[in-house]
Amino acid sequence: MKLYIIGAGPGDPDLITVKGLKLLQQADVVLYADSLVSQDLIAKSKPGAEVLKTAGMHLEEMVGTMLDRMREGKMVVRVHTGDPAMYGAIMEQMVLLKREGVDIEIVPGVTSVFAAAAAAEAELTIPDLTQTVILTRAEGRTPVPEFEKLTDLAKHKCTIALFLSATLTKKVMKEFINAGWSEDTPVVVVYKATWPDEKIVRTTVKDLDDAMRTNGIRKQAMILAGWALDPHIHDKDYRSKLYDKTFTHGFRKGVKSE
């Protein structure tokens, strides 16, 4: 038995990978997170495929359904939003499935952090400014490990991408400030990146909570923070070594500067 776990991408049905789409179109049974995955994408399933929504299922119910269908000899795919590796809760599914002898293939997808960066026309790693991106979430009802508190992570002063934190912006602001961030540090909030009702909000650490409330954003938002998100970054002249004419690498010999 084999299960395919497919990353659907951030929203736009055209952003699923070619491989993911092929598997979706071949599957006899499609289980998908209906609260987050585009119906337009799922509509590309093959005619006659059994399509099951999982938002209302608990773990054992979902895994049991997949096992039942695979034991009937059917090709089953599990479609997750974004990339399954990021907050996809796939490990708990895999543990139960592997106990039953199921082989698993994971097909990666475009995660919302990079869709949000694209929407904001941002590069998250700017030479001489920041070369690090931290992907994390604020601590809410679900705790984070002791050494992963946002205040501690933010002390690196790099670009930070916050998943699952739209209702925790007051806490986010406090932890950024406690980490030594200035109140005018740029923040970009992208609501439903790549969906038709996508919204981009540019703000600062100081005004983050007000901006979220003003725009009515309470879920499905990616928060990008740090000076790489400076709205005036395009007026500056940060340059990488990669395309510097004096820089030598395996595909090009640099020339001496005059």
UniProtKB/Swiss-Prot annotation:
Q: What is this protein called?
A: Cobalt-precorrin-4 C(11)-methyltransferase
Coiled coil start-end: none
- Pfam families annotated for this entry? TP_methylase (PF00590)
- UniProt GO MF annotations: precorrin-4 C11-methyltransferase activity
Family per similarity comment? Belongs to the precorrin methyltransferase family.
Q: Does the keyword Methyltransferase apply?
A: yes
Entry keyword Metal-binding: no
